[in-house]
Regions:
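Interfacial segments of alpha-helical transmembrane regions
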Residues: 2-10, 61-77
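Ser/Thr-rich, low-complexity intrinsically disordered terminal regions
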Residues: 23-35, 39-46, 55-69, 79-216
């Protein structure tokens, strides 16, 4: 009985691992792997695992030899559910397309625009991001490329007055595109996600990271 309850506590972490591996291997999309398996089914299993762990702890009070199994079950269950609760607070409703200049936002290079169309991303207009402002300086394209790399992006192309890049997440491969537009006296940044998943203020965070590297 106790071993079965331990297995119940391990279901959510196991499903999370399967969701990540399946997405990385291309067995299913990030929307399904993260949105359905990890965030929806995994959350249900996390609560089920915690219930199983608590039952195992009650059994351990009667049979001391079950203390080890109960402790392991509670550790996994509490850690997994805690992770989900933290993610719920992070994954708030936030813009997935942000820019430092909303009146005249930078546009993505043709290669990025083509990739976004092939990925089925619909056209969107950047929205405001609290605290995101342009860099009040004209930087060299090499400096902009360096800033993108420091912020975790892969540089895809550079030109005298622009740099473009892409960043893929380590777990589910969620992709964010970035473009840096360079003009006299200011440098603007735009970051937009490709996936339909709501991952909180990730686009805003990445854009701020790029601007921080551009600002002396």
């Amino acid at each position: 009985m106790a071993k079965l309850l331990l297995l119940t506590a391990l279901l959510a972490p196991g499903l999370l691992l399967a969701a990540v591996l399946g997405t990385v291997l291309g067995l299913w999309s990030a929307d399904f792997g993260m949105g359905v398996l990890a965030l929806k089914a995994g959350r249900v299993l996390a609560y089920l695992g915690l219930a199983g762990a608590l039952i195992a702890c009650l059994l351990a009070f009667r049979e001391r030899r079950l203390l080890g199994i109960a402790g392991v079950a509670l550790l996994f269950a509490a850690g997994t559910l805690g992770g989900y609760l933290v993610q719920e607070r992070r994954f708030t409703d936030a813009p997935r397309d942000v820019a430092t200049d909303l009146s005249d936002p930078p546009v993505f290079a043709r290669v990025l625009a083509a990739e976004r169309r092939l990925a089925g991303v619909s056209e969107s207009r950047p929205q405001a991001c609290e605290g995101l402002v342009s860099a009040p300086t004209q930087v060299a394209s090499e400096t902009a490329a360096w800033a993108l790399e420091k912020a975790g992006f892969t540089v895809l192309g550079t030109a005298p007055f622009r740099v473009d890049g892409r960043k893929e997440g380590a777990w589910f491969g969620l992709t964010h595109d970035v473009t840096v537009r360079i003009r006299p006296g200011r440098t603007d940044v735009r970051v937009a996600g490709r996936d339909n998943l709501q991952v909180g203020d990730e686009a805003c965070r990445l854009a701020k990271a790029v601007v921080a590297e551009l600002t002396p």
